[in-house]
Amino acid sequence: MDKDKLLEGRRILIVDDEPDVLDTLEDLLPMCITTRAATFEEAKALLEDQYFDMAILDIMGVEGYELLKICNEKRVIGVMLTAYAVTPENIKKSYDDGAASFVPKEEMHNITTFLTDIYEAKEKGKSFWWRWFDRLADYCERKFGPDWQKEHGFKVR
């Protein structure tokens, strides 16, 4: 299936305190209706007042985990994004707290693939994380070692 078609018209809130990240994500998602927020307060107000299919949430600068709680309450798919907090603990926390994916900023250029995986998994009734581990297995093994999933108790499939 064409990635753009699956994402076309989706309303996505992009939250990050770095303007260049907001610009890049908007450029990568022209098929979506994007709204941007640079602060926790701005994102919280948008989530409370508007409808979104999905929110891409920076973990560090904008209190991403607090925003994820709001997303879960509003049934908005939450995707965690980070540059500095790429750790097994944050991946596990994102998974446990109900995020649909965890995207390292250095993999941001593949955002359409990650988002498409989420919608494909949703259509198939599978865990949102089923393809994530396949796509980022090499990246994570290089960064954390070959047994990182087992050591941190991941059970997705």
Q: What is each PLM-predicted segment?
A:
Residues 5-7, 73:
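Short, flexible coil/linker segments at domain boundaries that flank nucleotide/cofactor-interacting
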Residues 19-35:
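Two-component/phosphorelay signaling modules centered on CheY-like receiver
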Residues 115-116, 123-157:
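CheY-like receiver
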Residues 66, 73, 85-104, 109-113:
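Alpha4 helix (beta4-alpha4-beta5 surface) of REC/receiver domains from two-component response regulators
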Residues 10, 14-17:
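Acidic di-acidic motifs
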Residues 19, 36-54, 62:
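Acidic, metal-coordinating helix/loop segments flanking the phosphotransfer/catalytic sites
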Residues 56, 60, 68-71, 75-88:
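A short, hydrophobic beta-strand element within the central beta-sheet of small alpha/beta folds
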